[in-house]
Amino acid sequence: MIVISRHVAIPDGELEITAIRAQGAGGQHVNKTSTAIHLRFDIRASSLPEYYKERLLAASHHLISSDGVIVIKAQEYRSQELNREAALARLVAMIKELTTEKKARRPTRPTRASKERRLASKAQKSSVKAMRGKVRSGRE
C-alpha cells in the first residue's frame, strides 16, 4: 500500500513493477543484473478518487502517456530495492504535485526603497555614459 495522503492510498496490485537491465556505466554488473525498475500506473483503472484522476489526466506531464498511464523508469542506484523505492517516491511526489491547488499570486507593488535603488542605478549608468563623450575645455 503506497500512501499518498491521509485519505488516499494506492494498493500494490494497481502498480505494475518490472525489473529491467539498467543502462550506462557499470561494466559486467550492469550488463548481467536487472537492477533498473520500470513502474507503470494506469490512472483510469486505479482506485484514486475522481478528483485525483481528473487532475492527473488533465495535466500535460512528460511521464503521463496519451492513454493515461504513468511510466517511471528508475536506474540511479546499483540496487534493485533502492531503485524500487526511488520509483515509488517519484510517483508519490508527482501525484502530490499535480493534485495540490496552487496558491493564487497576490499582486504587490514595488517598495519605495526598490524604486530608489532603481533610479540611483539609472542615474549612475547615465553619468557613466555621459563621461564617454569627448572632453571639452572650458575656454571655448
UniProtKB/Swiss-Prot annotation:
Gene for this chain: arfB
PROSITE patterns recorded: RF_PROK_I
Binding partners and assembly: Associated with 70S ribosomes and polysomes.
Stored SUPFAM superfamilies: Release factor
UniProt protein name: Peptidyl-tRNA hydrolase ArfB
GO CC annotation terms, alphabetical: cytoplasm
EC number: 3.1.1.29
Family recorded in the similarity comment: Belongs to the prokaryotic/mitochondrial release factor family.
GO molecular function: peptidyl-tRNA hydrolase activity; ribosome binding; translation release factor activity
PANTHER family for the chain: PEPTIDYL-TRNA HYDROLASE ARFB
